[in-house]
Design a protein with these regions (language model features):
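Structural detector for short beta-strands of small beta-barrel domains
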Residues: 1-30
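A non-catalytic, helix-rich entry segment at domain boundaries
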Residues: 130-207
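Extended, charge-rich, solvent-exposed interface segments
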Residues: 74-123, 129
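Mg2+/Mn2+-dependent nuclease catalytic core
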Residues: 28-57, 200-314
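Cysteine-cluster motifs in flexible loop/terminal segments that predominantly coordinate metals
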Residues: 99-103, 317-326
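Short, amphipathic alpha-helical segments that act as regulatory/interfacial helices
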Residues: 124-135, 263, 267
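A residue-level signal for conserved active-site and pocket-lining positions in enzyme catalytic cores
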Residues: 99, 127-128, 224, 262
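Flexible glycine-rich surface loops and low-complexity tracts that mediate binding to linear polymers
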Residues: 51-77
Length: 326
């Protein structure tokens, strides 16, 4: 029996019309008036998106990614992205994943909470400044005192208004932590980067590159990336998971999800295959440069959660009545 070779498409934008238990029925804008079938709910391919299909509405924009087309013209995508022009922040999406589980409600809870000028956020900003100083140090070693003076010039209001720093003991602990992160970044950039297992070249790096990924409907900013996109680092000044395994420190779930999404962004926006990427989580507290790996099934689960958030946002706008939001 002759095997028919399936056609493959990287990305396809379609309009949703309706669905049944096995297929979506869609139209390709500006092509023709033909209705196409999209197979969903296939185990190991796109089953992660099945429970969102009832949330789709007529005329919704969908991105179909990594699509195979069989001999009958039926589309079978690996990703189904609802309203991809709604660019969700990667950090906000990753925060839906907590130690106790994940839920789209975490996204809305975070949006309703006031933004606090808290110690962890301030420490993270200062740690990013330390990274800048060590990466761009050209022939001289950054001085801690001079760098902290720069931090005071850059964050004067935040430092003055942080309630945690009004207590003398907490203030001392904060600046002790600043010194610790400075020293750890010094060791990481000057020594760990040069180790054979990492091979990181700070002279050919970009700090804080921003990306918009329309295929997946997300956007974000990395902390460190090699110019050839072979390697990137996401830095965290907080604690890792110290409890799941008593013998080692592991990345927290939200941090791990963040890395998955950055890998997907580089693949779909920059055509950099995830198999060739070397992503690392840098926990400056320890310090620990942790290699992060992923499976596409995990990424699909995160994008599926994104779809549920987008569907809720659009539902609130379209209904605009308390009977829907109660």
């Amino acid at each position: 029996m002759k095997r028919v070779k399936m056609e493959k498409i990287r990305r396809l934008r379609v309009l949703f019309f309706y669905s049944d238990k096995a297929y979506l029925y869609v139209e390709i804008p500006e092509k023709d008036d033909q209705i196409y079938q999209v197979r969903y709910g296939i185990s190991g391919v796109n089953e992660e998106f099945s429970d969102q299909i009832p949330l789709f509405w007529r005329g919704a924009n969908l991105n179909l990614l990594d699509v195979t087309i069989d001999e009958k013209g039926v589309f079978c995508p690996s990703f189904i992205v609802l309203e991809p022009d709604y660019l969700m922040d990667i950090s906000s999406l990753a925060e839906c994943y907590r130690d106790y589980g994940s839920h789209p409600g975490n996204y809305f809870m975070s949006r309703l909470m006031p933004i606090e000028n808290a110690r962890p956020l301030l420490l993270g900003n200062i740690a990013n400044l330390f990274l800048d100083e060590w990466i761009y140090a050209d022939g001289h070693l950054p001085d801690y005192r001079a760098t902290m003076q720069k931090a005071f010039r850059q964050y004067p209001v935040e430092l003055a208004a942080c309630e945690d720093l009004l207590d003398a003991q907490k203030e001392k602990a904060f600046f002790d932590d600043c010194r610790m992160h400075f020293d750890h970044l010094s060791d990481t950039v000057q020594h760990t980067f040069d180790e054979a297992v990492y091979r990181l070249d700070k002279s050919d790096a970009v700090l804080e590159p921003s990306y918009i990924c329309e295929p997946l409907g997300i956007q974000g900013r990395l902390d460190y990336m090699q110019r050839d996109m072979s390697c990137f680092i996401e830095m965290k000044s907080g604690k890792a998971d110290e409890y799941s395994d008593k013998n080692k420190v592991l990345p927290k779930e939200n941090n791990r999800v963040q890395m998955l999404l950055y890998m997907a962004v580089l693949e779909f926006s920059m055509n950099c295959p995830h198999e060739k990427q070397r992503p690392y989580l840098l926990y400056t507290r320890y310090p620990l440069l942790y290699p992060a790996r992923t499976t596409w099934a995990q990424v699909r689960k995160v994008i599926a959660l994104r779809n549920r958030i987008v569907a809720s946002e659009y539902g609130a706008q379209m209904h605009n009545h308390e009977s829907y939001t109660e």
